[in-house]
Amino acid sequence: MTVTTTTTKNSYSANGTLHSFAYGFKIFADADLTVIVRSATGSETTKTLNTHYVVTNAGTDSGGNVLFKFNTGTSSDAHFSTTDHRPANNETVVILRSLTKSQGTDYVENDPFPSTSHEDALDRLTFITQEVQEELDRTIKLSKTNTMTSPEFTTSATDRASKILAFDSSGELSVTQELGTFKGDSAT
């Protein structure tokens, strides 16, 4: 398949009764998804496959659904549980593609070219690149023309403890206890 979308995650508002949430991108296996529920207060909980939810349509180009488990009344339902795992009202459901960063395609010398597995391997690499880009898109970055010499902290973890990120008079990364005109302990 050609990879025609850069979507790697979907986000939804829950209402306490919805149990089905779509993911609009290809995954190869059910375990290729990470499902996180964020509470109204901001705490995040990563849910567990087959305990809190099940996945449909792994392997299809168009995606599928995450079905949170609850008491459907029919124990043969794939998403049946005696415990209600549906996200509560005002919670946010985030579904992320999260592939294992490995390459499992093996070519055997003198065998016919395995076009399907080769295409899947290329798709997997593209998906991994998209996941990395999605993470980079959520980071603080310097502009391409920035002349900062090092984006690394040279200060030890002990020296950074209880301080805030800052830029020094040269524009380099630094840590300080000063915030604006306030100077002192960050706990006060």
Predicted regions and their residues:
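N-terminal assembly/attachment segments of tailed bacteriophage virion structural proteins
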Residues: 1-122, 131, 135, 152-175, ...
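Extracellular/surface-exposed low-complexity repeats and stalk/linker segments enriched in Gly/Pro
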Residues: 137-155, 185-188
